UniProtKB/Swiss-Prot annotation:
The lineage of its organism: Viruses, Duplodnaviria, Heunggongvirae, Peploviricota, Herviviricetes. Heterotetramer composed of a homodimer of the large subunit (R1) and a homodimer of the small subunit (R2). Larger multisubunit protein complex are also active, composed of (R1)n(R2)n. Pfam families: Ribonuc_red_sm. The chain crosses the membrane at residues 157-177. It comes from Psittacid herpesvirus 1 (isolate Amazon parrot/-/97-0001/1997). It is an enzyme of class 1 (oxidoreductase). This is Ribonucleoside-diphosphate reductase small subunit. GO terms for biological process: deoxyribonucleotide biosynthetic process; DNA replication; release from viral latency. Keywords: DNA replication, Host membrane, Iron, Membrane, Metal-binding, Oxidoreductase, Transmembrane, Transmembrane helix, Viral latency, Viral reactivation from latency. It is a single-pass membrane protein. GO terms for molecular function: metal ion binding; ribonucleoside-diphosphate reductase activity, thioredoxin disulfide as acceptor. One of its GO terms (cellular component) is host cell membrane. It is found in: Host membrane. Ribonucleoside-diphosphate reductase holoenzyme provides the precursors necessary for viral DNA synthesis. Allows virus growth in non-dividing cells, as well as reactivation from latency in infected hosts. Catalyzes the biosynthesis of deoxyribonucleotides from the corresponding ribonucleotides. PANTHER family: RIBONUCLEOSIDE-DIPHOSPHATE REDUCTASE SMALL CHAIN (PTHR23409), RIBONUCLEOSIDE-DIPHOSPHATE REDUCTASE SUBUNIT M2 (PTHR23409:SF18).
Length: 313
């Protein structure tokens, strides 16, 4: 192309990716902010937990808060790879909502530490050294450190595993609190975040399927290897700090859900499934981990989860 030639569409929005545009619009329709939820309402529920149970949820939220960096580093690297504005605009929405997730996790952490920020700092510095968290981070670092040998399709398999597998047991464990009518606001934010991450993983599947033409896909053997490793790590993470008395959560049901979820993502990218686990029982508490069950936050938001608006005009 000569210096005088250019594509006019570079200078205005042109829809090119209907699948990504739909996910972008879905993300916009379901925007929310952490200040719309009143986390202080959950503070009384800390007294309902045993010491083991409280430590378990502190550990879960320690990982979730730290994991935002794993996602955002990858997003920063991926967003520049595509000229299509639909993909760029989708990623702008994802990056925005990831910052909301980060602030939400910080607020929820403080609830479990009874607003003692110093105690949280001490705990986090020790918890991130725990083998169950380090194994996740080291596994991701090993994949990322393959450098130029890691193809673009493999990077998207990595994103599918980060967002679609490495959060699943945490989301499920949090959702079990609802069965005991405690931490209602935390459960509400967990519903919203798990829904967001389902959208994000679906977007990675769409890009992998439709927008990586010219890039050879990894073999089924390679994909299965990565999925099996991720599922094993995720299931081990769940039991690392699980309460000795399983009063709140069903570990077997959550691990089965992790494997079922892996099969679902494999099917979405056209790869044979690995596991025999059935769909979760209808009573399984993680109600919003599928797009089919997506609802707009503002359709069911109530004052119980909203901050107080002061009219000072």
């Amino acid at each position: 192309m000569s210096a005088t030639e250019f594509l006019a569409s570079e200078y205005y929005y042109t829809g090119e990716c209907p699948d990504m545009r739909e996910l972008r619009d879905l993300s916009i329709a379901n925007n929310w902010n952490e200040f719309e939820l009143c986390y202080a309402r959950d503070e009384k529920d800390v007294d309902c937990l045993t010491e083991d149970e409280c430590d378990f949820y502190k550990f879960v939220f320690c990982f979730l808060a730290a994991a935002d960096d794993l996602v955002n580093v990858n997003l920063d690297n991926l967003v520049t790879l595509f000229p299509q504005k639909d993909i760029q605009h989708y990623y702008a929405e994802q990056i925005r909502i990831e910052t909301v997730h980060s602030r939400t996790y910080s607020a929820v952490q403080l609830v479990f530490f009874r607003n003692d920020a110093i105690a949280r700092d001490r705990y986090v510095l020790e918890a991130v050294k725990d083998g169950a968290i380090r194994r996740k981070i080291d596994w991701l670092s090993r994949i990322q450190n393959e450098g130029d040998e890691l193809t673009l399709p493999e990077k998207y398999i990595l994103m599918i595993l980060i967002e679609g597998i490495f959060f699943v047991s945490s989301f499920a464990a949090i959702s079990y609190l609802r069965r005991h009518s405690i931490f209602q606001v935390t459960c509400q934010s967990n519903d919203l975040i798990s829904r967001d991450e389902t959208i994000h993983t679906t977007a990675s599947c769409c890009i992998y399927n439709n927008w990586l033409k010219g890039h050879p896909k990894p073999s089924v053997k390679r994909i299965h290897q990565l999925f099996k490793e991720a599922v094993e790590i995720e299931c081990d993470f769940l039991v690392a700090r699980a309460p000795k008395a399983a009063r709140l959560i069903d570990i077997d049901a959550i691990q089965s859900f992790v494997r079922f979820t892996a099969n679902r993502w494999l099917s979405m990218i056209g790869v044979p499934t690995i596991y025999d686990d059935p769909a979760p029982d209808p009573t399984f508490p993680l109600a919003l981990m599928s797009l089919e069950k997506n609802v707009n936050f503002f359709e069911h938001r109530s004052t119980a989860y909203s901050g107080n608006l002061v009219n000072d005009l």
